[in-house]
From Swiss-Prot:
Subcellular compartments: Secreted
One Gene Ontology cellular component: extracellular region
Reaction catalysis annotation: Release of N-terminal Arg and Lys from oligopeptides when P1' is not Pro. Also acts on arylamides of Arg and Lys
Family indicated by similarity: Belongs to the peptidase M1 family.
UniProt name for this protein: Aminopeptidase B
Gene name of the encoded protein: Rnpep
Self-association state and partner proteins as the record states: Monomer.
Active site positions, chain numbering: E326
Marked site: Transition state stabilizer: Y414
Amino acid sequence: MESGGPGNYSAAARRPLHSAQAVDVASASSFRAFEILHLHLDLRAEFGPPGPGPGSRGLSGTATLELRCLLPEGASELRLDSHSCLEVTAATLRRGQPGDQQAPAEPVPFHTQPFSHYGQALCVAFRQPCGAADRFELELTYRVGEGPGVCWLAPEQTAGKKKPFVYTQGQAVLNRAFFPCFDTPAVKCTYSALIEVPDGFTAVMSADTWEKRGPNKFFFQMSHPIPSYLIALAIGDLASAEVGPRSRVWAEPCLIEAAKEEYSGVIEEFLATGEKLFGPYVWGRYDLLFMPPSFPFGGMENPCLTFVTPCLLAGDRSLADVIIHEISHSWFGNLVTNANWGEFWLNEGFTMYAQRRISTILFGAAYTCLEAATGRALLRQHMNVSGEENPLNKLRVKIEPGVDPDDTYNETPYEKGYCFVSYLAHLVGDQDQFDKFLKAYVDEFKFQSILAEDFLEFYLEYFPELKKKGVDSIPGFEFDRWLNTPGWPPYLPDLSPGDSLMKPAEELAELWVTSEPDMQAIEAVAISTWKTYQLVYFLDKILQKSPLPPGNVKKLGETYPKISNAQNAELRLRWGQIILKNDYQEEFQKVKDFLQSQGKQKYTLPLYHAMMGGSEMARTLAKDTFAATASQLHSNVVNYVQQILAPKDS
């Protein structure tokens, strides 16, 4: 086992953490009984046909876990999170200090136990119980083929169409279908990996060390402790290009020039601004991997190597806020982590706030308020569809046993979370002071997982005068209400600095609502100078006012080819929604084309909702499009689209 050691992060926090008692109903593992110190993966990738037969595609090898028993009374069994797609064939135990090759390796019995539809428990029995504080290594020999954690793409699902591709996606609870682990954000460990690939392929991982070992082997090491969901691997036909002093872009060769052009020189500016605000960037490198088009997310903040959708290659740097969001996770989420998935707002609400602080410094308050207004519109849309009183519209979500945390995903932790952090800044009343507080918060809880109580107690201790005033229980704005009551945020940050960009968009949208639009007034507005988010805001207003009077959408598309023929994904999404809301069948093909070009969940699901909520022709379009694209979508997205096409409760 390549030992990475846990570094100096075992120093207890200055306070006992509430999160030390946190339960995680989404994990079958005994993560409170054992401390995981290090994980090492030694895997070989094979690209064969799908299926269980010989020569089929899969990852095979070993996962070695370095563990320490935490129970005063010792333990005779260890439970890990696993999945039916993992075939474990052997387990051996080596007691004593890590790397002690003199210690005998003994085979140990193991079996699986049912847990939920998204995983199972792997139970390993010790022939002799381990005592309190005993250390040992457990080596598991296994293979994973088809399953939800490892995504295999055929050549036609990639941008280059020449070679297959494989990647892993751990968040929220999918890495148990990649390797046996404590699949909970409550605990963290360092990891290393040795990955063998076929000729002509390159492996990359979320690690701060990347070494080529011989023609087909790659060694990785992550020297800081991270939760299991942030361990990520991708293998494909990959090239790289430097875009800054500590950043490079990775992509298929056909995309590398576009990626280099779009992000050269800008990432360092984002990182440096983040460091000024939130403290040192501890992860060493910040690289970007542009994924194949079927990647279901805008970005996944795997440390050192963010996985991003190729939709971000807009050609005009207009979608850089997604990168700022992922960079912000370097402090909020990756360094300080939610202890379970019911506290997801601690990752995402803070990251939205951090993203918008960086954006304000780099692009100004007007632009940032405009972007935040589009976020607020998404929250409004979500709450209109789900109903404000839906329990998922609380910041603290109660995830019931058996419920996949991924199924609770929505805009609330992002945008309502952002509103709560903004409210706390508003209580402080001084932006510099609140920035200093955020830096102190990161420093206090770095490399740890926390609950809302840990954060809020720290906030009130940091600002004793606010504690004295009882700001946690101001009627209507109680911290408990913020966390545990569903519905619209009690406080909304002031977005009026964005009025200079929003007002013209609102006024222009009004002109399109009349049955005889004043084309002279419309053409006097120079939207050619508008930034992408101003156009997005305008289209959101048009969508809210749809259906428009007959003929207006056709005229709108003809007047603004910049919108109706856009290549920018945010514009294509909204234009598609407007087409469907107005049943503008001449342009239906554009909806299908967009859904065939990418598989991002945030773009895909709203369009299927709009098609199924539209005319008979729109519903037919939904079924035809899904039949044509299902094979190139991520398995989670396929499941969600199927639920939209044929709701279970209908």
